[in-house]
Amino acid sequence: MSQIVVGPLLRFVSDTEATLFVETDGECEVEILGRTEPTFRIEGHHYALVRLEGLEPDSRYEYEVALDGERRWPEPGSELPPSVIRTLDGDGPLQICFGSCRVALPHEPPYTESKDTDEDGFEVDALRMLARRMVEGDAREWPDQLFLLGDQIYVDEAAPETRERIRQRRGTDTPPGEEVADFEEYTWLYAESWREPVIRWLFSTVSLSMLWDDHDMSDDWNISVAWLEEIRRQSWWHRRAEAGIVSYWIYQHLGNLSPKELDENDVYRQVRGNQRADEPLFEWAREINATGAGTRWSFYRDFGRTRAIFIDSRAGRVLEEDRRAIVDDEEWDWIVQHAHGDFDHLLIATTVPFLLSPAFHHLEAWNEEMCDGALGSVAARASEKLRCAVDFDHWAAFQESFGKLRDLLSEVAEGKLGSAPGSVVVLSGDVHHAYLCEVGFRSDGKHRSPVYQAVCSPYRNPLDRKERRVVRAGFTGTLTAFARTLAKLAGAPDPEIRWRLLDGPCFDNQVATLEFEGRSATMRLEKTVPGREDDGALEQSFERRLV
């Protein structure tokens, strides 16, 4: 009889609908709450996205998962609470947890020790501690949503069991060595990353939204045209890239879509229930890898009176000799179309921060001008190498896109695109530290809703002491003044906004929580403590009322 390999993952949830994802070890029919869905098959792996419709708003449904009529979830002997689906209440309070960057490592010494005291230390997983608190706590205090904003897996730092399986399967003497090479190895990494019982329970009970970042595909993915040209010369890259696209679509993106969007998705229509789905899915992935076209990865979710727009900040980049952009014009038009007011709160989720520390913003803007030839071709080539070496790949390094998002935020906050919301918050991860900034626009006499940049990273992958010193320097006046001068001399445009650090930077394994009630909003950051895994091991770093 078939067994569950990955999942169940609770994905899209509205007031009357929900979708749940499972991977199984054989072809079967998956049943949840009386709804059934046949699996589809990709290179010997079997998947289903079960759709539940006609649910009651503001309701709680305990559920089990059956494969061909045999119960497979919860697992026999599990002491975890029942998995539940909680449909939305359009007018009620909303709690969203978010963050990014989570390595898959054992939860035992030395891996749970501080990185400063043990080279193998990655400290304690913040999501694991969140789940354990939920298990022991009041269900009325559980988060409604969990945003995973990039680097859900690390293909270039494969988890221990995946690395060992790679050694046994093909060896590591030739590229890409211990990194993931194809779809089969991607499936191992997802399974190892999401298989721990308490994480499985968390993902089965809190609705998940996901965006990919570079480590889901490759370190520095799509940082520049020079990087892209170099990686495409590697014999192993195209197979990796196609596998990365297919695996992301299956494990992460598919569940971001509503039932209506699934009905309209041409690729899903070809794959659903198909026992030979490899051909259409990999053909589609080859087209995307070759041309960069073929899909829009950005999406949006409405949670009652709060709208969240999730911007794909990696796959859809424009990388040309004379132009750089985070997304192309067509996708940007889609973002503008959906980023209107008329909500109590507007969230813009983008894996890479819109606003960095002021010094590093100016350094990235300077670097882009240098790459574009501000001081000639020799300096441009050196600047491209610097861009990759120090990860200058955020919105500040794509000034065209930075300016567009800045202006969009201003227009929404002014009420030019519908009624002004109570708050506008940009949510990001990627940078392995957390902070909260308030955005200041030019003094023009116009009233604007408060606008914030909220960053939370990592769930589990902390910086070492040296890296932390570099990050802190970016918030100092001395380095900011120096970097601003460099950027100005190179011809970089002024950002035309200023931002004030309210809280942080914080360098722990951590999880952020946004709480909304009516037009009020609060942000809280909580951290884990190296070596400590008791049920009270999440400690508050800061809490701030946003509006």
Regions found by a protein language model. Name each.
Residues 1-547:
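Metal-dependent phosphoester/phosphodiester hydrolase catalytic core
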